[in-house]
C-alpha cells in the first residue's frame, strides 16, 4: 500500500533534490502547522509553534520511502545523532485534513534563522 509524504525543502518540485521524487505521484500543494528553519543549504521543520509551512504531498511506494529515509538520515543506529525523524501528522491538502509522513527537525530552534 502506498504512503503519503509531505515534502517542504530540497525535495519539492524545482528544488535541488526533486529528482529523488521522480517515481512518486504528486498529489498537490499542502501546508502544515509549524516553523521552517534555515539549517544550511536545506531547511528543517519544527511542527507546531503557530505558523504554517507550505509544501507538497506525494504518494510513494515502500522502496522510495526507504530511499528518502536514508537521504534524511533516518534509521541510524543511534537516531539521536540524526537531524530528523519521520512522524505521521495531519496536513491540509487542498484544504482537506490528510495524514502523511513528515520529516521533522530534531535539533531545536536555537542558533537557526526562521524562514
Question: Would you name each region that the model predicts?
Answer:
Residues 1-115:
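Glycine-aromatic micro-motifs
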